[in-house]
């Protein structure tokens, strides 16, 4: 049985698309396919670079164009200090030392790591480790970034660090595919794709997904925290329409009742 089938996903430059679904729905398989880390079992499967992932050449091309960040940053940290880890991919590609230094400094600044440049990875917090891994992935210029539940092992502060960093990449024109089971992380997406048994059962706006209560329940997704609070208020006789999905929307909706 194929893990994915009949899935058509288009993500534009600067666009943030969230991918959600229950365990086993195909989210991680999609992330690995997009990054050229697995070979599709069936028909042609192409990514932003136009490469066909059925061929080894196509998968190698995808790995150059598509950066992938996974749950556990320690699996992607390979050097003895932060700046050496960020430089690792560039050194393997044969970049000139001056170009490497400039690019590493750029990445350290972008991901708020300059003060930690000589720090050993095992001394970093979870959020700092994930930002270091992200800087290393993107030190090599990419067109697409795929993140597979990158905050799953982080505390709330670490999650906020990583989300702020990822959302900041949109302004740079990077296409972002963000796999998550945290519904609060979906709220800031441009679009959301919901998977079930390897197929997309919803693709569209965030409000449209969470407005379909039956589908959300069937997929076992839950709602963002603000939406859950709004449902409790509705049960208590204070319905809010449309359903607020963020804290700001909830506060605005409650203020509008006065």
What are the language-model segments listed below?
Residues 145-148:
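Catalytic Walker B motif of ABC-type/P-loop ATPase nucleotide-binding domains
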Residues 137-138:
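ABC ATPase C-loop
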Residues 35:
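Helix-to-loop junction immediately C-terminal to a conserved catalytic motif
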Residues 98-116:
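Conserved ABC ATPase "signature" region
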Residues 20-22:
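The feature captures the beta-strand-to-loop junction immediately N-terminal to the Walker
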Residues 198-199:
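Conserved ABC ATPase "signature" C-loop
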Residues 120-124, 128:
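Conserved ABC ATPase signature
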Residues 44-61:
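ABC ATPase NBD Q-loop/coupling interface
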């Amino acid at each position: 049985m194929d893990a994915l089938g009949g899935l058509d996903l288009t993500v534009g430059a600067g666009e943030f698309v969230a991918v959600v679904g229950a365990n086993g729905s195909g989210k991680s398989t999609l992330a690995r396919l997009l990054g050229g880390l697995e070979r599709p079992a069936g028909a042609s499967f192409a990514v932003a670079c136009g490469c066909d992932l059925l061929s080894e050449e196509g998968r190698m091309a995808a790995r150059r164009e598509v950066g992938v960040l996974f749950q556990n940053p320690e699996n992607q940290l390979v050097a003895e200090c932060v700046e050496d880890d960020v430089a690792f991919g560039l050194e393997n590609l044969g970049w000139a030392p001056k170009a490497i230094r400039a690019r590493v400094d750029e990445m350290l600044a972008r991901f708020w790591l300059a003060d930690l440049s000589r720090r050993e990875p095992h001394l970093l917090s979870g959020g700092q480790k994930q930002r270091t891994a992200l800087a290393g992935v993107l030190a090599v210029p990419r067109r697409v970034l795929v993140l597979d539940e990158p905050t799953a092992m982080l505390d709330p502060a670490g999650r906020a660090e990583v989300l702020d960093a990822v959302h900041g990449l949109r302004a740079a024109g990077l296409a972002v595919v963000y796999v998550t089971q945290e519904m609060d992380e979906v709220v800031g997406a441009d679009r959301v794709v919901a998977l079930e048994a390897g197929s997309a059962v919803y693709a569209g706006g965030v409000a449209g997904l969470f407005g379909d209560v039956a589908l959300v329940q069937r997929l076992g997704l839950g709602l963002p925290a603000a939406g859950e609070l709004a449902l409790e208020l509705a049960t208590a006789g204070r319905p809010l329409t449309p359903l607020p999905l963020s804290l700001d929307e909830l506060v605005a909706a409650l203020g509008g009742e006065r």
